[in-house]
């Protein structure tokens, strides 16, 4: 379970993380990870949100996918820098994925979106 202070809640927060200035995205067949570090949030807790659409499946399947993603990310909160908002969007294939696969994808994609862009180019 994610602590309350680490959750994205408002649609404005989701929009800023998905499309805001400085947002970064990396994706795979299972999930897409968006991250945004806003100067206004410097020093605050990292926040995480999940987007699991009806394309993933019915309500039971969507909730199962969200539970698995939440559990995987709760164990990785320490890797997310302070002031960073992360949104994880599940693709339909995520409904058949096991937790270990989701965890590996989260690790790989978090590394890609959280690596500073200047270091990535060098």
Q: Which stretches of residues belong to each language-model region?
A:
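Positively charged, solvent-exposed patches that mediate nucleic-acid binding
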Residues: 1-122
């Amino acid at each position: 379970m994610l602590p309350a202070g680490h959750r994205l809640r408002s649609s404005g927060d989701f929009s800023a993380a998905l499309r805001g200035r400085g947002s970064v995205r990396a994706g795979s067949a299972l999930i897409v990870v968006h991250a945004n570090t806003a100067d206004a949030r410097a020093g605050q807790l990292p926040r995480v949100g999940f987007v699991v659409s009806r394309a993933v499946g019915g309500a039971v399947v969507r909730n199962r996918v969200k539970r698995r993603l939440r559990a995987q990310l709760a164990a990785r909160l320490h890797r997310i820098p302070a002031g960073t908002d992360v949104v994880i969007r599940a693709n339909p294939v995520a409904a058949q994925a096991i937790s270990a696969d989701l965890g590996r994808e989260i690790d790989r994609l978090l590394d890609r979106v959280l690596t500073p862009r200047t270091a990535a180019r060098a």
